[in-house]
A protein has these predicted regions:
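Elongated, mostly alpha-helical coiled-coil "stalk/stator" tethers of large membrane protein machines
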Residues: 1-108
Length: 108
């Protein structure tokens, strides 16, 4: 990787490649790509969701509950839901916008 890349860019690319590999290996690439587009649309259109996800003071438990609810209501793939839960566990959920953008670039 280029040394000029920021930590957030490198981290986002690493996570997006991991999601891409899981989606590809489980033959869910189209489904997860569509789910990520739906999530990205929600994230970009809802300041409440954006602020909630980017707020570092939110507890992991609260973030997990919100992701579980969103996943259920929007019909996200189990793999995408688990990926979001991993991001929360690793305290990387605030990278979700960059990860989503990077993932969608990989899909195109």
């Amino acid at each position: 990787m280029s040394t000029n890349k920021s930590f957030s860019s490198e981290t986002s690319e690493r996570y997006s490649r991991a999601l891409f590999e899981v989606a590809n290996e489980t033959n869910e690439l189209d489904k997860i790509e569509n789910d990520v587009r739906n999530f990205q649309s929600l994230f970009n259109s809802s300041s409440e969701i954006k602020n909630f996800i980017q707020n570092p003071t939110q507890s992991k438990n609260t973030q997990n509950n919100v992701i579980n609810l969103l996943s259920e209501n929007l019909g996200f793939s189990k793999n995408l839901k688990n990926f979001f839960l991993l991001l929360i566990e690793k305290r990387r959920i605030f990278f979700v916008k960059k990860i989503s953008e990077s993932f969608l670039r990989l899909c195109s």
